Design a protein with these regions (language model features):
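Extended substrate-binding grooves/exosites of carbohydrate-active enzymes
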Residues: 1-219
Length: 219
């Protein structure tokens, strides 16, 4: 239903292939891709192309989808490039996006039609846009809205009006990930998340990072 709503309302959508493996190349905050998956391992190639095919065949007729994404935070390699070849062969006119080309520039011209980053500062975005940019720029993930944050959103919005090559971004998250339960003491309905149910380990408030509460009320 969501994709049909986007079609009707004119909401722009990027359809992302179900792939994320950042734990295989980001270790304790450092980029160490010696064993990143899928990378260029031939045994993974068929699996990732199958996921790209599933993405394309499921959503290809939705007019709201402007571009395809090869996945999220999975570094780069020949297998990712093979996914891009798959989408290119479909010749449906949509662009292809992949953020992790930023970490391996050897693939930047073969796995993404866009220059795309996560959580880049406004001044870094502007620096790229002022230096003869080859590709449109998108922040595929930014404004992680946890606690008293998101005060810098206006700085990014100003860039949209200033630069034709800046195409905005995707906020993570839109909605808090929480559930409504009845408080045993007060009897009131309250929103709870990781750790509130004595579950260990838990993500705690890390799941409460949306720009609206889980019940869709404004913060």
């Amino acid at each position: 239903p969501w994709y049909y709503m986007c079609d009707d309302a004119g909401i722009y959508v990027m359809a992302e292939t179900n792939l994320e493996s950042h734990g295989s190349f980001q270790k304790l905050g450092a980029i160490e891709p010696s064993c990143n998956v899928p990378g260029s391992f031939p045994q993974w190639k068929g699996a990732v192309i199958d996921r790209a095919k599933n993405n394309f065949e499921t959503f290809k007729n939705h007019t709201s989808i402007l571009f395809w994404s090869l996945g999220n935070e999975s570094y780069a390699g020949d297998d990712i490039e093979a996914m891009n070849v798959y989408f290119a062969e479909k010749q449906d006119g949509r662009l292809v996006h992949y953020e992790s080309a930023y970490y391996n520039r050897a693939y930047e011209d073969t796995i993404s039609d866009l220059e795309t980053r996560m959580y880049a500062k406004p001044e870094d975005v502007e620096k790229y846009l002022n230096n003869s940019p080859k590709k449109p720029y998108i922040l595929c993930e930014f404004m992680h809205d946890m606690g008293n944050s998101m005060g810098g959103l206006g700085s990014y919005m100003k860039l949209i009006d200033k630069y034709d090559m800046y195409h905005g971004g995707f906020i993570w998250d839109y909605i808090d990930q929480a559930i409504m339960v009845k408080d045993p003491v007060t009897g009131k309905d309250v929103l709870r998340y990781g750790g509130d149910f004595d579950d260990k380990p838990a993500d705690y408030e890390f799941s409460a990072n949306g720009i609206v509460f889980a019940d869709r009320k404004e913060k």
